[in-house]
Amino acid sequence: CIKQILQIITILPDLASGGTEVLSSTFLDESPSISPNGIMVIYSSTKGTSKVLQLVSADGRFKANLPGAGGQFKFPAWSPYLTK
């Protein structure tokens, strides 16, 4: 279960224990989208005056900035990998 409190993305891995894992560290993170296999979360974040995409594993061990060609990134979503 994912919930967003003050735009800080958290994961609740064990609803019985209520334990949480903080996956982002600013109030400028929003629009999380969980991968179909539940392993990764992609979300938009603000860096300076631009929106960027951030990728983080559900356990918080892996974090990456996804490069873009500029512009504003909002509402990321997962889609199937297509080959020609």
UniProtKB/Swiss-Prot annotation:
UniProt source species: Actinobacillus pleuropneumoniae (Haemophilus pleuropneumoniae)
Cell location: Periplasm
GO CC annotation, single: periplasmic space
Listed InterPro entries: 6-blade_b-propeller_TolB-like, PD40
Entry keyword DNA-binding: no
Known partners and oligomeric status: The Tol-Pal system is composed of five core proteins: the inner membrane proteins TolA, TolQ and TolR, the periplasmic protein TolB and the outer membrane protein Pal. They form a network linking the inner and outer membranes and the peptidoglycan layer.
Protein name: Tol-Pal system protein TolB
Organism lineage: Bacteria, Pseudomonadati, Pseudomonadota, Gammaproteobacteria, Pasteurellales
UniProt cross-references to Pfam families, sorted A to Z: PD40 (PF07676)
Record key words, sorted: Cell cycle, Cell division, Periplasm
Function: Part of the Tol-Pal system, which plays a role in outer membrane invagination during cell division and is important for maintaining outer membrane integrity.
Domain of life: Bacteria
SUPFAM superfamilies on file: TolB, C-terminal domain (SSF50960)
Family as reported in the entry's similarity comment: Belongs to the TolB family.
GO biological process assignments: cell division
Signal peptide interval: none
